[in-house]
Amino acid sequence: MAAKDVKFAGDARDRMLRGVDILANAVKVTLGPKGRNVLIEKSFGAPRITKDGVTVAKEIELEDKFENMGAQMLREVASKTNDLAGDGTTTATVLAQAIVREGAKSVAAGMNPMDLRRGIEIAVAAVIKDIGKRAKPVASSAEIAQVGTISANGDAPIGKMIAQAMQKVGNEGVITVEENKSLDTEVDIVEGMKFDRGYLSPYFVTNAEKMTVELDDVYILLHEKKVSGLQSMLPVLEAVVQSGKPLLIIAEDVEGEALATLVVNRLRGGLKVSAVKAPGFGDRRKAMLEDIAILTGGQLISEELGVKLESVTLKMLGRAKKVVIDKENTTIVNGAGKKADIEARVQQIKAQIEETSSDYDREKLQERLAKLAGGVAVIRVGGATEVEVKEKKDRVEDALNATRAAVQEGIVPGGGVALLRAKKAVGRINNDNADVQAGINIVLKALEAPIRQIAENAGVEGSIVVGKILENKSETFGFDAQTEEYVDMLAKGIVDPAKVVRTALQDAASVAALLVTTEAMVAELPREAAPAMPGGGGMGGMGGMGGMGF
């Protein structure tokens, strides 16, 4: 086991504080509409330019191990806020730095760190309650656009694009962000249920130009197992032929004699048919087949339920207005399922999302929910260079996360105003224990940090801005750093999602309180390099070669 270096008390806190300051100072230059970019070296390819706090925080690794521990704890603040709210990482970092610095001063002055921590927790609880009271629900598409615009750094087209995508797919829908090959940024809406399985044979293609299968007013047979024999399928095929409508078969697989017969029927024109594999694997495949059954008003043919393929009737088949299948994907549009059944299934999936602790499972459940409840929108981010596209993609992702958070918990005045106004709620708290009160006062002072930083990044004195806002009695009065004017923040559309502000403060205070109560730090001592091997003394027995006449 390697030897360790241990630092105590003031020495430990000083080193830790240096690390906190290095990371926070690199991150906080990005805050606000006039925040600057940070350029990050990459081991290969062009450097990355970003205005995203968590991206900067993740890149910082310091040489001094004690300083690095402080920096890594602060990085944890940004990461946690990003995971929970998807935005507000820079605000969280600025708040954490302010709490740690004031806390370290108080500890150095002889106050009890555990009492300080209690005071910090009491004050944070009061602020969160205050933010909850101030939050205003997001009602219109215009308000969603405002949130997106602010989070994308004043880029109005991005805000509008996100609002448009949310309007199309609903709040439950999935919106993904991808890089575009062209210069333009655009929204692509996929209506209906789309899954990543294509046709099993190119002979099913109905549109040779696009190489797609297009089936209108179609019957859908959903089978849990493989279909390989023809005999069991004959009754249902004959019934579909008589109805004169096309048929789509979704099963674990269709192979052998069954697939050959379907292809021959399709080519002879007797039956307009196509077959695809069921999406997903194992239990997830079964769940997705059940989703499709509910969406199309059909029944999943499963031997567990006592239904065999031979006994299937037309009533058991699902229906849809249109199905489009290409080489890789299948899209079912306007399924004939009952609204009440679909809604019940949506609620069931929502309950599973609440219960699951696995991020992977949650993501898959959300995908299923979106396919049932609304659809999928893809925002394709374009730009002139790869560096520009990546920078813009960071901003679009932040804006998307912010709008989702706004829909969940509502909006509050932006630009650091909500935290500044919460000072009133904290100021009302009085505690008999002087050290606990000092902890409350630490948060009271830290609540000014984000608005001061926004002002300073805009080249304005932070303390003057804070003073002017607090003088005004209006709860929504604040500083527009873009125009350097004092305005009504809600009327101007400068808003923050309440969830982002709340999460930023909670995560900042949680990690900062841990740092304030740290009394010792342990790090591995750097290993001394092993001495180099002594130089070789030549090959033995070669000494007599000196006389050779070279």
From Swiss-Prot:
The reaction(s) annotated as catalysed by this protein in its Swiss-Prot or TrEMBL entry are:
ATP + H2O + a folded polypeptide = ADP + phosphate + an unfolded polypeptide
Residues recorded as binding ATP, renumbered to this chain, are 30-33, 51, 87-91, 415, 496
One short Pfam name that applies is Cpn60_TCP1
- Which keywords does UniProt give here? ATP-binding, Chaperone, Cytoplasm, Isomerase, Nucleotide-binding
In terms of domain of life, where is this protein from?
Bacteria
Q: Which GO terms describe its molecular function?
A: ATP binding; ATP-dependent protein folding chaperone; isomerase activity; unfolded protein binding
Q: Which BP terms from GO are recorded?
A: protein refolding
Stored InterPro entries? Chaperonin_Cpn60_CS, Cpn60/GroEL, Cpn60/GroEL/TCP-1, GroEL-like_apical_dom_sf, GROEL-like_equatorial_sf, TCP-1-like_intermed_sf
Please give the Gene3D superfamilies that the UniProt record associates with this protein: GroEL (3.50.7.10), GroEL-like equatorial domain (1.10.560.10), TCP-1-like chaperonin intermediate domain (3.30.260.10)
Q: What is its EC number?
A: 5.6.1.7
Record's subcellular location: Cytoplasm
Any one of the GO CC terms: cytoplasm
What the record says about family reads: Belongs to the chaperonin (HSP60) family.
Query: What quaternary structure, including any partners, is listed in this protein's UniProt entry?
Result: Forms a cylinder of 14 subunits composed of two heptameric rings stacked back-to-back. Interacts with the co-chaperonin GroES.
Its job? Together with its co-chaperonin GroES, plays an essential role in assisting protein folding. The GroEL-GroES system forms a nano-cage that allows encapsulation of the non-native substrate proteins and provides a physical environment optimized to promote and accelerate protein folding.
HAMAP family for the chain: CH60 (MF_00600)
Q: What is this protein called?
A: Chaperonin GroEL 2
